[in-house]
């Protein structure tokens, strides 16, 4: 079983020289603050999701890749019963976490939003893992975790849709485990514990972000599957000649703060999709496996149960692409039939409760208690269309990759790939309502200036778009985005800010421990 690697140099980066200067700067900051060298570094990269958005928590496969930007944390242990959190970014002020002397797991005040809360949630899951697997390290729970002195450095844009929070949490969890004497952890275990970390700050993530960050490999994208179990399969992407394809990521600089806007955005989608699955199940008198974060059914669960109970066919195992596409098409056909034109507009709470055969109180208890949300009407028809259509597009992209041969027309491949990305953006905009005016604008500019496809990546409502182009068209695309979006929207933007906003990345190495032989 693959374990998280430890590196003794920086050759795992695509640009080791640039990162050597970054590590040296972080080391200098650490020595100035704590008057000692760090024992080690922990790092985890951001990710870009190529296609498949808001479908991971419905257990449908997605296609992300780890990218060159990452979160690094420099670490040393301390005899003090506290954790000192610092950051090279002055926006993130120092925080001190007092460790309970009785060895209890720390708690989080969810009403007080600070960057330190993401470390707290990392400490909670790391501590629980230690209690479960290595209780002797903490005297069976009677002894606190080791005190830590930490400085973080991250170049994953916060709120940019590139999973800065997952990168931060995974790097933090790795740091805590290593500092407390756990030198080896499987990638599978690290995914399991990190997936639930952000739940402690009220964000119900589905697992794709953490999986992509942990399993990333240089020059390989990832197929992340959630059934029959959570797993990531690296695969090489087609090499096109004479001009290879490239992904450009543009941060709109409109921050998508999942924690603060979850009530009406991210968490509402989680709830709407859970309601949608139970709505469809009720139509066919099906009992769904309780596998969502709300302990309800999921849209994947509905599809599998429909095929098993109504059509007497086995559950889809996720590997047969043609079968998957056919089943998504059937789900989309059913969706159109099962919702009346009036219902397609949206449901009030009372209407949904009636459809599910519940009182308003029962509906509230099942769907609106565990994850707080705010809405006027739930648009469960739209969310259903988005989930099944984007899940189908993931499979269509996979098929495109598998079928491509070196002798094939690269232009034909790029047009087909781009069309699927554009269809995904249209669905995010119209059916999932997770795009934004700024995201629509950068996608429009892209398609007029050398982009084959462009779509919102990450949670949405701001953040970043991913653009598909080729190396020969890259300079024109960067210039167009710079002149027509960034300089218009942000006239005072600096060159360094521009460089951070527009990222061209190849698939990068995943999470690791770094113990440099020399500093």
Swiss-Prot record:
Keywords per UniProt: ATP-binding, Carbohydrate metabolism, Galactose metabolism, Kinase, Nucleotide-binding, Transferase
Binding-site list for alpha-D-galactose: 47, 53-54, 56, 209, 266
Catalysis: reaction(s): alpha-D-galactose + ATP = alpha-D-galactose 1-phosphate + ADP + H(+)
Pathway: Carbohydrate metabolism; galactose metabolism
Record-annotated site: Transition state stabilizer: 47
SUPFAM superfamilies found in the cross-reference section: GHMP Kinase, C-terminal domain, Ribosomal protein S5 domain 2-like
InterPro entries: Galactokinase, Galactokinase_CS, GalKase_N, GHMP_kinase_C_dom, GHMP_kinase_C_sf, GHMP_kinase_N_dom, GHMP_knse_ATP-bd_CS, Mevalonate/galactokinase
Gene Ontology terms: cellular component: cytoplasm; cytosol
GO MF entries: ATP binding; galactokinase activity
Gene3D superfamilies per record: 1.20.1440.340, 3.30.230.10, 3.30.70.3170
Catalytic center residues: 209 (proton acceptor)
GO annotation terms (biological process): galactose metabolic process
EC number(s) from the headed UniProt entry: 2.7.1.6
Binding site for ATP: 159, 161, 163-164, 257-258
Family that this chain belongs to: Belongs to the GHMP kinase family. GalK subfamily.
Function: Galactokinase is a key enzyme in the galactose metabolism where it catalyzes the conversion of alpha-D-galactose to galactose 1-phosphate. Can also induce the transcription of the gal genes in response to the organism being challenged with galactose as the sole source of carbon.
NCBIfam families: gal_kin
Name of this protein: Galactokinase
Organism: Schizosaccharomyces pombe (strain 972 / ATCC 24843)
Gene name, Swiss-Prot/TrEMBL: gal1
